[in-house]
Structures are given as C-alpha cells and as structure tokens.
Amino acid sequence: MRVIFAGTPEFARVALERLLTAGFTVPLVLTQPDRPAGRGMKLQASPVKQCALQHGIAVAQPLSLRLDGKYPEDAAAAKAAIEAAQADVMVVAAYGLILPQWVLNTPRLGCLNIHASLLPRWRGAAPIHRAIEAGDAETGVTIMQMDAGLDTGDMLLLEKTAISPADTTATLHDRLAQLGGRLIVEALEMAACGGLKPTPQPAEGVTYAHKIDKAESTIDWNQPAEVIARRVRAFDPFPGAATTLGADAIKVWSCEIDSCSRTLDAACGQILSIDADGIGVACGAGSLLRLTVLQRAGGKRLPAADFLRGFPLAPGMVLGAAP
C-alpha cells in the first residue's frame, strides 16, 4: 500500500516511523515549512521532515493547499506531487494545514486522521491539553476518515487510555503518540483487506479543544486549587503555568493540592507556609496549593527547596499581585 504522510510535530513523527517499520511504502511526506527556533532563531526542520530525509523520502512543504488561496503556486506544486505519488491513502497527523476537498478526493481510500482524543469529545487543535485541563479521567486516540468538517468524519478505530493524576501534557502526549502509531498501522492493514467499518460520530458529547493561547498561562489564584493544579499539568511543557512576584516572572511546573483548608481571611495568592514539602499558597474556595517545582525567568526548573535558595520567598508575600 502506498501512503502519503502529512504531519509536522513529534506526535506525527512517531506515526511515520511506525508506518515505515511496518513496511508501508511512503513516496511523499507533507509537512509545515521550516520555522525559526531556539535561542539563535535558526530555521529548523520539523520532526517529520527530519524523519523523512533520514529515510530518503521526498518532502513537500507548501504554505497552503488551497488552489484559489494566497499561495496558488505552492498549492499547484503540491497537487502535482500528490497526484504523481499515486497513493492509495493519505495519513494525516497534526499537520497544521486545512485539507481542501481535492486533497481528500485524490487518494483511492481518502485521508485518514490520527486524532488524540475520543471523538466527538475534544475536536480541534489542543485535545491533549484540554482533556487534562478539564479533569477527564480518560482519553485516547481515534482514527477517523476525514471529511470537509473539523474532525467530524466517521470513526474507524478508537482506543482509550486512562489519564493519571500525575499526567502532564508531555507524558500523555508521548503515550498517545505511541498509541496513534500502533492504531494507524492496524487501520491500514484492515483497510487493505476491506475490514474497516466506518461509524458516524454521535451527535451528543461534542466539545472543542481550542488552540492554546499563551495568555492562558497566567495563574488565577482565585480559582480552586484543584483547577489550578490541572492547568499546571495541562500547560506542561507549553506554555507553562505562570505567576509573578512583583516584577519577577515565575513558572510553576509541579504542585500538590494540600488537604488542609486555609484560613479564609488570607488573600488568594498569598504565601502561607514554606517548608521541606514546598510553598503553600492560598487559592479560591478556601483551598491550599503546595508548589513543588518552580522556575524563574532565564533559569531552570528546580525543586522548591533549591528554588528558594536563589529566590527567597516568605509567608505573607502575595503571588500574582500587581507590582
């Protein structure tokens, strides 16, 4: 079976590697254009492009696939490459470009998407972050037959995984990437013998995982500790849950909900205790959060005890207050 692969980040690279290991022929890879990255802001190829080049696979990096859009020459060149590949199917994983109908129609078996949620819950750009942020007990991967809608196509395969209280977006991402790679191989093997049975998504339970905005990273200490703790986990590694002390920026990478209720006369964001277990901070609804791993601007992630050696804090100080 000839497979065109369209994807960009690490999540997609894992799936591409699994397809190649399973013996599928991949004549063409589509991925986002190289972007500036790192401290030197040098152009950097996506993980998928790096993988493709290592395996000698042709790579196309169009700015758009819309023939009537802003970059028609890019789209026309991509169309020629896609048609020349004579693929049976296209596999799409976190590609980052909208696929026009002509793309969906070109491969014999259409386009299959690896989506990191249990559809129809968390359609959209950030399903892993949003599942953790919402406190979901489980998530998973859905292999979907793509149509013109936003993650609305028929489901082909689905597998669940539990979200543990310790999971961050980083850990859950890695687990789902492996699951997605395994499921897409299974789906293509089933498709080769006509064994896939499309199931329409249910009309109930639709939610949208909107793209993460960096502005969301600011911790609102008026929220209950449980809500803040979920956001800390959801925003690791990006964009990181952030607060301030005066003019100094601080990121919180790990925390624990303290079972001891705080005194209600303490201001939300006020530091109530500092000990070997971390920094106790007053939160909304009379709750208490213990910060255990922190980072100051330009520094490294540090356990609370090490962080405090270079950034002294004291009970009574208020995090997130205007300087």
Swiss-Prot record:
The UniProt record gives the binding positions of (6S)-5,6,7,8-tetrahydrofolate as S117, L118, L119, P120
Signal peptide positions are: none
Please name the Pfam families in this protein's record.
Formyl_trans_C (PF02911), Formyl_trans_N (PF00551)
Q: Name one GO cellular component term.
A: cytosol
Per the UniProt record, which EC number(s) apply here? 2.1.2.9
Q: Which is an annotated GO molecular function term of this record?
A: methionyl-tRNA formyltransferase activity
- Database matches in InterPro entries: Fmt, Formyl_trans_C, Formyl_trans_C_sf, Formyl_transf_N, Formyl_transf_N_sf, Formyl_transferase-like_C_sf, GART_AS, Met-tRNA-FMT_C
Q: Which reaction does it catalyse?
A: L-methionyl-tRNA(fMet) + (6R)-10-formyltetrahydrofolate = N-formyl-L-methionyl-tRNA(fMet) + (6S)-5,6,7,8-tetrahydrofolate + H(+)
Q: Which UniProt keywords apply?
A: Protein biosynthesis, Transferase
Q: Which domain of life is it from?
A: Bacteria
Q: What does this protein do?
A: Attaches a formyl group to the free amino group of methionyl-tRNA(fMet). The formyl group appears to play a dual role in the initiator identity of N-formylmethionyl-tRNA by promoting its recognition by IF2 and preventing the misappropriation of this tRNA by the elongation apparatus.
Family under the similarity heading: Belongs to the Fmt family.
- Give the protein name, as stated in the record: Methionyl-tRNA formyltransferase
The lineage is: Bacteria, Pseudomonadati, Pseudomonadota, Betaproteobacteria, Burkholderiales
